[in-house]
Amino acid sequence: MSSIDISGRYALNDLEMVSKYQTAYACEGKKLTIECDPGDVINLIRANYGRFSITICNDHGNVEWSVNCMFPKSLTVLNSRCAHKQSCSVLAATSMFGDPCPGTHKYLEAHYQCISAAQTSTTTNRPSPPPWVLNNGPPIFGNGSGLIHPPGSPGAAPPPPRLPTLPGVVGISGNGGLFNVPPPHTVTHSTPSSSTVPGRMKGVATSTTTTKNPAGRHDGLPPPPQLHHHHTHHGEEAAPPTKPSSKLPSAGNATAPSNTRILTGVGGSGTDDGTLLTTKSSPNRPPVTASNGSPASGNNSVVRTINNINMNAAGMSGADDESKLFCGPTHARNLFWNMTRVGDVNVQPCPGGAAGIAKWRCVLMKRLPDSGYDEYDDDPSSTTPAPSGGDCLHNSSSCDPPVSMAHKVNQRLRNFEPTWHPMTPDLTQCRSLWLNNLELRVNQRDSSLISIANDMSEVTSSKTLYGGDMLVTTKIIQTVSEKMLHDKETFPDQRQREAMIMELLHCVVKTGSNLLDESQLSSWLDLNPEDQMRVATSLLTGLEYNAFLLADTIIRERSVVQKVKNILLSVRVLETKTIPPSVIFPDSDQWPLSSDRIELPRAALLDNSEGGLVRIVFAAFDRLESILKPSYDHFDLKSSRSYVRNTAILANDSSDSNTGEIQQRIRILNSKVISASLGKGRHIQLSQPITLTLKHLKTENVTNPTCVFWNYIDHAWSANGCSLESTNRTHSVCSCNHLTNFAILMDVVDEHQHSLFTMFDGNMRVFIYISIAICVVFIVIALLTLKLFNGVFVKSARTTIYTSIYVCLLAIELLFLLGIEQTETSIFCGFITVFLHCAILSGAAWFCYEAFHSYYTLTSDELLVEVDQTPKVNWYYLLSYGLSVSVVAISVAINPSTYTQNDYCVLMEANILFYATFVAPVLIFFVAAIGYTFLSWIIMCRKSCTGLKTKEHTRLASVRFDIRCSFVFLLLLSAVWCSAYFYLRGAKTDEDTTTIYGYCFICFNTLLGLYIFVFHCIQNEKIRREYRKYVRQHAWLPKCLRCSKTSISSGIVAGGGPAAGTLCSVNTSKKPKLPLGVSEEVHGEQQQHQQAMGVPAPEDAIMGATSDCELNEAQQRRTLKSGLMTGTLQTPQQPLAGHVVLERGSTLRSTGHASPTSSAGSTHLIFAHKQQQQQQALGESYYHQPDYYSWKQPPQGGLKSQREYYNNAGVAASSPQQAHEVFYWTQKPNSQHGKKKRGGAVPASPSGSLHSRTAAASQVLFYPSYKKTKQGQPSGYPHYAEALDPPHSAGAAFYQQQQQMRRQQQQQQQQQQQQLSSDEEQAEQHAHLLHLQHQQQHQRRVGGQQQLPAPPPHMAHFQQEFMQRQFRNKTSNCDLAMGGDTYHNQGSEGGADVCPVYEEILSNRNSDVQHYEVGDFDVDEVYNNSVGTGVFNSMRAAITAGGSRYGGGSLSGGSVSSRSQQQQLQKQQKQQQQQQQRSARRCTADDDDDDDEEEDDEATAAEQLHDSVCDDDDEEEDSDLDDDAHKLPPQSDERMRRLMAMQDEDFKRRFQRQQRKNGASIDYGALPPGVAPGAGSAGPHPDHNRAVFGVSGGVGEGSMRGAYRQQQQQQQQQLNAKSPSARLAVNELFGHGNAGPPLPPANQTPAQKRQQLQKLSPQSTTSSSSHTSHSNLQPHPHPLTHQHPHPPQHQQRHLSAMLDENNTVRCYLEPLAK
């Protein structure tokens, strides 16, 4: 029967007339001429100018030329000259094509066809006839699967004549199937002819033809994979236009793809057993219905074939399927492989330097179906079964039409694609010229074996070898050993004989090592698997023969070791009498590449001794395991994928026909090969077995170790005589009863050996990165919050616990992110797993301790206060980190491989150690944490049912919230870790739930980060407040964000009640804080009156520590306007003069130094007002500046006398201020649990908050400290009378005129903010005015009248300096007018300019002096009790006796006129001292009781000051009686006065006794503290008289003791220096004159400040007392000695306020420059 072509282009009987493509060559420098017959034109297929063969155009046999030389545009150049022409000539020169490889002689090669000029389309590129022809092979079974009988086997049909067809196409349907054709009786046998191009070189084949596979070629099994390919994809333009690019295998897919399955077909003749059909997954393939054919009986097989059929009857056009019948061009092994038709073998000469031919076969690769359908079923649209038998080919009426047949064939071909097989070309017949030469030499009789061996080792190490060279080399090795066995007898000398054989052995070992080297791996891949096994066996036996050649030569005990790169060979000759109990090979220092070991027992050696000697040959090989691969046991799809990567070998499973259900089992060689021999190639049986310890090369995803040896006869591994004794993850111990080459075979479970991220899809990988990044960012924010705002919290155990938890979580996240990127071969893998294990254990431990701490807090006294618990925290540190490190260390010591050999680098191996050291501790910690949480919850429920105090309820609510947060935190963290664990475990087995666990981990991990930020940062009110402060004080944010737009009094202005405008409305029903000196009853009445009169109710607001919000003119400030009259509050359009409202969350700005003890910056309380004029309309009431001199406290604390200021006619210009802003500090209780004793230890930085409230003036009693008085002359200064009695002063006109002038000048200068420079003048002026007013009213009451004091003398020196300040654009706060020294509060009257007031808000509880109005109590009693009774009486006596003045200001304002008055004062002093002593004793007892009391967080400043002396209720009643009798200030101040008086009196007595001992006769008690002993009689110099007034002493220093001790030390030091331990006096702090320069203007830039400081001379500095050592005060030279006046130095210092250790806001100066 005639054969029909599938393409339809050729007639049935025209197979021999098909146009053939021809090849033409032209050497470089010559012309290539192509000619076709008349009527035909040239159709170029491909061309190249370069060199692909070493034999073409190489007359001299040069082997150094490049054979990988190609000019890519060769075809384009030839097409421009020859396309569609009958003949053409092209010069083969670099001028035409370029020079792709300089130095190599090139040639031009062209493949073309001569086609008819009438043809309009390109014909096929190959001359071979169509492959789809009838096949007379045996029919297949009905289900498409059948038993394949190799040719010649029983049951197989006689092989038909060789056909140029595609044999072994896979069968389709069952009985009566479409292609089930009976074997024909006759077959047309056509063979493609070859023609030689005229002028072609002799011996070169004209075209690629289909040839018979050489004998011994085994294509049934794939060869080992190629680790690195030399393939490059070229010549894509030579592909047919209809061929998709995906069908052209490139360098990577020149062989079967990694997920292919190779199936062996049948057909053909001779040794060629057909084309290999491979399967490949095609996810886009449309589903096909299952076959209706019933399975036939017979043996099933995974190998299925298609009968060779005649496709021409189908009438199918080959245009669509032509591309599926060719393998694309590619480069491999220095050869260019042209496009080859499926089923053909491409044959060409070997690469340069080698002789022989190279072959490569093109086969079809079939895609694997996606589901369980039969991949060979018909199209779903075709449901009619084809008739059975051969009727389809002869009776067209009973068959499908030809179009249907072509459609069905297309459906079949769509599942195939061509590919090259095997993975690399077959170069078994290629032999290098050098090795051929060596083979000729070794066979010569007089050849030098040593020279040949040396040359062979050199060639194999430096030259490129091919598959045939491996065969030649191993053959030479065996030949050399055989010849040396005969030649050694010619050496009579034993030593010479041993030396010759040893040198030969060294060359042979080196040659074998070269063959095993990685550089020669491609040479092994040139061989088919059978040849590889044969060469490996020959190499092992050749090495063994040469080794025993040396061993037999040695006649005494000796050991010879030959060590090269890949082979360690040891020859040992042992005497039987000296054989140890066991012989071990190799030594640890001999072979560091592996820890394998062979141990031979002594009895087994004695049985194989000869002549009293035992000769043993040991060998250890590297890289031989990649050559000696095991045979196949099972096969499946996953195995094939693993095979390509890991050199595993696949085989067919005849027990199952369903390939998808075949069990996976791949056997790999998993150890190095080690050898021991007692005879030449003999498997000697031993009386006692030997012991082998072999290390596993791969420890993951392997199982079932088997001890095997290499069988020389079968060229395969065998387990006979060997058994497995024991095994672990890294080693196996075997026992064998014979000797040969040993190794370990293991089954591969899964061959995924890569990082965790390689199995993630794209979305999951991105999500994991995002999730971990979010969690890490929020954890870092939480850590920074605890670090930056640590002053907000008490240093408690809970804060430390959460800090440690965050650190552990941060380490876990980073280690996890780093670990999933590593592979198990990475050096960091083990370290990451170890540290991750430790971090997880530590984090779980800290969670347990957090729950325990909550339980401990509820069951102890710590419920009321959160204090520092350093000892307990230290135990937590020890238990958490100590236990974690100990557990990990024990785990590492027991089995280090648990960390180093794992699925991924973030998880330990799932063994007993993993569950004992990881799972168990984590579960214990978590269960304990949950248990303590439930216990804590039960206790809270019980406590909530019992009656508790308000503070306990508050604290209990806080603990309840913490427990809830920590419990949710624990559950969320458990979800994160569990999802990560199940995800990693599921990823190993590719479970369906793995993706679910992965996305659960992503979600839970993201929620964990958000939860940490929200509930541990944002939810905390203190942290929120600190966030606002932090944002406002940093310039990198816009000012609109840094400056709050809500005033502190915004809640009052809006009239929204107590919670309106406040920062936190959690507790809006708290009891309002009382101002200083106001009782609760009076406060309640005042509140009602304020609500009726429109006065704002007291409102508390927490102020921030610092702020950059400057009080400039452009900023609008809220004020009270016309609300006090009508009861309504409104916001004015313009701010009023002198009114500064502090913005909520900020503080008053100062340019002082930052406080070193403040938690979040300096608490600046010193402030300045704007100099801004505001017209006052009728009926308006507004805030004045804090005006202390014109404000009156009602005598009885009520409101009757205060109501006279409220009238319907409006508020007069001189009306006092009706509301004030009060600032006070509340501190969290600390660990002292009581009041700080004087001279006690300095505690840590106090933590609390500064509060601001607005209250009516009648409710506020101010405590200005750091005041000093001046004595002036009223005759020279008429404005003093005006200051004392402003409405009736005779100098009012002069004063108003001066003030108007100053206002105009200040408005012209446009001053933006009042300065902080000259606080001393303001302080002097303020205190002096108060004292003058006291003295005036007292004299009026007793009937006496005295002259007003004159201004201090030192002020006269600086009058011009004060005036000059106006021209520096820096207005001093208390500059004097031109007409005289103005000592008054300039903001006291409505028409006056605004002047800032510098005020310390809280009074020092130790010894600060307070000032009160004269109307409240007698002035003499004030001065007798303010600082010290005896002190001021002594001062007055000194004034009377000597007429001296105190530093420019009199303390009393006048002298005592009579001795009776002095005696009366002394009598009152003694009575007062007795009362003070009794009170002090009671206070001392009360202080002891107060140590156990807790201070409320919201205690007011008045309450704190009250508690600082004593808190006993009985003592308060007694003190109130005294206050009522003598009209004294409130009781808390009285107690302070008594304590100060006792201390000063005691110091005075001790000081006087010391003076008497020294022989002094003067009563120093009558001298002022500023006068030195001995100077009173003569009268001190005016410059020496300085008053010490209202300065607290240091440790052991009272307000007067400091001055006396200072004077004593100055006398001893010749009045040149002061004691550094003495506290500075007020006049030193604020004084002018010779004592030091005046204070500077405040708001300067740092540059201006530095420039002025550089001009100063060095000044001595002294730190303050020990309890205020964090603040620097500026001392001045003491004024006791006479100093000449000198011009003032304009040094500028800044005044700051800060909180000291006594919880007092102190005002301090900037230190002078040294």
UniProtKB/Swiss-Prot annotation:
The chain crosses the membrane at residues 766-786, 800-820, 827-847, 874-894, 912-932, 967-987, 995-1015. One of its GO terms (molecular function) is G protein-coupled receptor activity. Keywords: Cell membrane, Disulfide bond, G-protein coupled receptor, Glycoprotein, Lectin, Membrane, Phosphoprotein, Receptor, Transducer, Transmembrane, Transmembrane helix. Forms a heterodimer, consisting of a large extracellular region non-covalently linked to a seven-transmembrane moiety. Belongs to the G-protein coupled receptor 2 family. LN-TM7 subfamily. This is Latrophilin Cirl. GO terms for biological process: cell surface receptor signaling pathway. It is a multi-pass membrane protein. The gene is Cirl. It comes from Drosophila ananassae (Fruit fly). Glycans are attached at N143, N253, N299, N338, N395, N652, N701, N728. The modification Phosphoserine is found at S1155, S1245, S1252, S1317, S1318. The record marks L739, T740 as: Cleavage.
